[in-house]
Amino acid sequence: MPRAPSYLLLALALVPILTFLRTRRPKRSSKLPRATERVVILGASSGIGCTLAHQYARLGVRGICVVGRRVDKVAEVVQECEVEVGKSKEGKGAKTEILGVAGDFADPGDMVEVRRRVEEAWGGLDTLIVAAGVSALRPPMAVAGAPNSASGSVGKDAIQHVVEATSSAMRGNYVGPLVAAVTFIPLLQHTSPRPALLLLNSPAPTRAIYASTKAASLHLYQSIAIEHPKIAVSLVMPSTVEGDFRRGAVDAAIFGASSVDGADGMSAVREADPNKYGFKREVVAQRCVDAIERGEKNVFMPWAVGLGHLLYWVWPAFVERRASVKYNFRAS
């Protein structure tokens, strides 16, 4: 244990070296020109996924497939992307084709249909971005309706609430990324000279259901990176991001209340106002584009969060306290 701090210092010293080496890598677009790149964005009807669609439209890629569950929202994003294509400088994006497909990324039938549409339109796929997911804000005991229970007794119905919330979170945060990977990996491998797969993922402490389901998909894609080395897998993990992602939290539906306003008597969102202090969607989306371009594996936002993962091995109590402070969490 006494040697642990020296290992931490060594890791810190390596950060600038590794950063420099990363910037020396040849850019993906030097081998796969933007004008030939075919992109599918799952979860593109809102949030960061929508912003990513706008950014790729401005880059002038060959095609973008916008995928989301709501037909009206998908159609809206398609129109917005077409406007961005029209505004691109010197007609750079004039040939970009925008497809819109409504579907649930956890539904195999829906994803097979997306794949069929992409193959029919472009004959293959180069970039798959998994930006879809669901939110869950409460600790399990709060979901059970007994955040301050001192008796140690939680009833069957309360436990069932936790199971239902977890099942919904698993479907959106693990099954969806799994279905997407199984559906599109063969197409990526066989039709792209530089296949890339990006998972947008933010495991958050003090939110056990959300964090555990997000961690499951994170480890899934880390394993996929080993099993399919020809595909450049990027894992982008931003901290708090602006937007209304939390409003549809799966653990709020159980109580029939808003997860944001705490109408059920529990303050679900504890951290500072995400729309005031969180990352801007445009910043996160641009970082995703850069990660794919540079072939980066693990991207933490802010970068210091990555150091927190290292520090956790040598000083876990400190990291746990800081996580509690960030999310304004007090254990009962």
Regions found by a protein language model. Give the residues of each.
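Conserved glycine-rich cofactor-binding loop
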Residues: 45-46
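Conserved glycine-rich Rossmann-like NAD(P)H-binding loop of the short-chain dehydrogenase/reductase
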Residues: 61-77
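Rossmann-fold cofactor-recognition segment
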Residues: 81-109
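Conserved mid-core segment of classical short-chain dehydrogenase/reductases
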Residues: 133-167
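SDR active-site lid
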Residues: 225-303
